[in-house]
Amino acid sequence: MRILLWPIHGGYTDAFVRGGHEYVLAVRSVRPGEDDGVSGWGWERARAVPLDALRAEHIDVVVLQRPEEIALVEQLTGRVPGRDIPALYLEHNTPGGPAVATRHPLADRRDIPIVHVTHFNRLSWDNGVAPTAVVEHGVPDPGQRYSGELERVGVVVNEPARRWRTTGTDLLPEFAREAPVDVFGIDAGKLQGVFGGRAAIEPVESLPPDRLHSELARRRVYLHPFRWTSLGLSLLEAMHLGMPVVALATTEAVRAVAAGTGVVSTDVDELRLAVRAFLHEPDWAREVGARGREHALAHYGLATFLARWDDILTETVAAWPLSRTATHTYANAGGKTTTTTVAHAR
């Protein structure tokens, strides 16, 4: 299939475009030599297409990620998602308001399925009459890198100062009572001085993924203090690295961190004591991290993720009413070869 999407989440897109399809990534026009935000990733099956060139592209299905993209697709391609071209909506987030009362922007549409990234998110949103599905996260395996040589706590959070209570940034001083906390992520530097020097919290400059993984794996334990977000890819990456994890028992963390693969609780003191135990017992930390890696590979590996997406895309296109069919064979990064029937607009 040829799939259109906007590459708005680099980490998620990095996993998604490793399948066996063709990926048309909508980007703004740039001058020669400027960064289009896509080319630097080295994706083999994905190509950046300027917005003003989308009308000439043949597209089999659209993966929407923001409400405004529905109108954008019509404006830029002349085709209405759900009517003139198969489409689905990938929802990355938890509800922004009260979970029991927040209606999804596509809740009144039957023609565009909503794909959630966690079971918690599907449960929490009011999806109305829209068809729904869940494709759980999958991440490329960075490999077993854990050494835990530094008696420090690692956490990855983007924009920790702005997102504050949402990401549990306010909780970091509690954990800094046990050991220095190194905060990685976009705009982590904005935490400099926020705690007034009262806590051993060290922002780390934003690092490219490979270096981030290597540096993170040197820390003794990974902390996931997020109160209200979708399951962070950084938590799954830490588990893939072989790190022991300590996580708030919120949103999807209770599913991701299975018994014996880390410590999950809503009691911050209990989590703080777990951090202390991992710091003092490196052999136990290594053992728990190894079990966590095994669990992450089995449940959040790339092959499973891509196979589930293959199923969802095939079902979406097959269910679209205004179509004729053609057969395509493709192989995803997990080695699975699939023959599928793809619909094309009349």
Where are these regions (language model features)?
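Aromatic "clamp/platform" in nucleotide-sugar-dependent glycosyltransferases that forms part
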Residues: 227
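Conserved acidic donor-binding segment of nucleotide-sugar-dependent glycosyltransferases
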Residues: 259-269, 277-282
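A charged, aromatic-enriched C-terminal amphipathic alpha-helix characteristic of glycosyltransferases
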Residues: 280-314, 318-321, 346
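Short hydrophobic beta-strand element within catalytic cores of glycosyltransferases
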Residues: 244-247, 264
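Conserved catalytic-core segment of nucleotide-activated headgroup transferases in glycan assembly
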Residues: 124, 140-199, 203-209
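Extended catalytic core of nucleotide-activated donor transferases of GT-like folds
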Residues: 9-12, 24-111, 120-123
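Short alpha-helical segment that forms part of, or immediately flanks, the ligand-binding pocket
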Residues: 213, 236-240, 251-255
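Donor nucleotide-sugar binding/catalytic pocket of nucleotide-sugar-dependent glycosyltransferases
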Residues: 94, 110-158
